[in-house]
């Protein structure tokens, strides 16, 4: 495998030469500030945050009914997702990268504020009438307020225990929004101090991996795309397979670089800067023998949010565990489709359908394939899975943009 990959690298260098140019990306980003509506949309998102805080304060003071508060919350949350879509659709000057960034930020704010509203509702229902000692005995309340068992070792480092409704402050909500978690709780575990060396190592990793990621695109992906200059929707099946195989290896490298750069370097950098104690962002997904284990351990932050605010409520409503898991997977597939198809303005459902195909594949793996064979199948699904299908979108977007320029 090492020899094969080395051969492919040298073959690429001999064929195309050295194409890596970090300055090109910076020059493109700074070329025209008027094409940055995404930056303004991210700033505007603060309005939704302030509205969410005001709703919770009003509910805690009994200034509005729960029904009215819930209605306003849903309108506010819906606006977080819909307004950037409408603005980006009208203002065509925004770049695809900028659009993807703003939709990612707004979707993260949506999930965080949904968790914020839900937890505060639980606290209003169970904490206030019972008091501290009685509430601590209630199942589910402890994890909402003090965190889960994995974080209890950091308890002594929490500066001050906050109780409801003293948590409804600007400082509290913005700490939660900036922290590397999607699930709200009043008292987050904290480390005792900021480790400067650890922070600098993570910063160096982030800078290095960003340049490596961009270099792979310039050196490996763009030449292959330019060579075909035909969108996948117009290709024959044999050409599609050939093109995907050419992109599979660089795409997989890019996925691994992105994973390490984001889930390890970036999230740990943010956590260290904020003294955030719960650092379990992923587990050993590379040892996965089933797709279920892979999806639940490669992104623990999102998995926790889905389990807490989607899966468990569905099970409590009477749905089976399998139905709950399937719904979570459908939600995840729609989320990935939203983040990719909307910025590129290409609604083809490729990512959604590919991820939905993994539902029966996950069932087959869990029933009939285990051990090393199961791990091998999981890796094949990773290499030829959603990441590669996402690349199909980007490939077609690039081809269509080149056609517009040359028209």
Language-model regions, residue ranges each:
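Non-catalytic, membrane-anchoring transmembrane segments at the edges
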Residues: 1-152, 166, 170, 242-251, ...
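Hydrophobic alpha-helical membrane-embedded segments
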Residues: 4-8, 107-123, 210-214, 254-276
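Membrane-interfacial catalytic/cofactor-binding modules of polytopic membrane enzymes
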Residues: 154-205, 210, 226-344, 373-407
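Core alpha-helical transmembrane segments of integral membrane proteins
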Residues: 212-215, 219-228
């Amino acid at each position: 495998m090492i020899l094969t990959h080395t051969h492919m690298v040298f073959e690429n260098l001999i064929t195309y030469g050295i194409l890596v140019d970090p300055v090109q990306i910076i020059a493109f980003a700074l070329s025209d500030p008027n094409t940055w509506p995404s930056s303004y949309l991210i700033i505007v998102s603060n309005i939704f945050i302030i509205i969410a805080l005001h709703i919770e304060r009003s509910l805690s003071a009994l200034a509005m009914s729960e029904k009215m508060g819930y209605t306003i919350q849903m309108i506010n949350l819906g606006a977080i997702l819909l307004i950037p879509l409408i603005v980006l659709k009208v203002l065509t000057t925004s770049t695809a990268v900028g659009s993807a960034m703003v939709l990612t930020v707004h979707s993260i704010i949506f999930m965080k504020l949904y968790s914020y509203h839900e937890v505060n509702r639980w606290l209003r229902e169970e904490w206030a009438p019972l008091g501290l000692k009685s509430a601590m005995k209630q199942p589910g309340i402890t994890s909402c307020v003090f965190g889960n068992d994995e974080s209890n070792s950091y308890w002594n480092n929490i500066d001050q225990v906050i109780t409801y409704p003293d948590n409804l402050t600007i400082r509290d909500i913005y700490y939660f929004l900036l922290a590397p978690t999607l699930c709200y709780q009043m008292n987050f575990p904290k480390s005792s101090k900021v480790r400067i060396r650890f922070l600098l190592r993570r910063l160096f990793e982030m800078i290095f991996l960003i340049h490596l990621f961009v270099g792979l695109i310039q050196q490996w992906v763009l030449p292959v795309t330019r060579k075909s200059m035909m969108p996948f929707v117009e290709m024959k099946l044999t050409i599609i397979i050939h093109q995907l195989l050419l992109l599979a290896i660089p795409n997989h490298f890019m996925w691994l670089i992105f994973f390490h750069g984001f889930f390890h370097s970036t999230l740990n950098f943010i956590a260290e800067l904020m003294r955030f104690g719960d650092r379990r962002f992923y587990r050993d997904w590379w040892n996965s023998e089933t797709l279920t284990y892979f999806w639940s351990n490669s992104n623990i932050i999102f998995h926790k949010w889905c389990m807490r605010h989607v899966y468990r409520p569905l099970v409590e409503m009477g749905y089976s565990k399998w139905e709950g898991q399937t719904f979570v997977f459908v939600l995840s597939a729609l989320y990935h489709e939203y983040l990719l198809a909307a910025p590129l303005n290409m609604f083809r459902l490729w990512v959604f359908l590919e991820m939905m195909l993994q539902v029966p594949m996950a069932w087959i793996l869990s029933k009939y394939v285990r051990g090393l064979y199961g791990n091998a199948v999981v890796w094949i699904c990773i290499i030829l899975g959603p990441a590669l299908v996402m690349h199909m979108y980007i490939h077609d977007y690039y081809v269509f943009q080149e056609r517009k320029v040359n028209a």
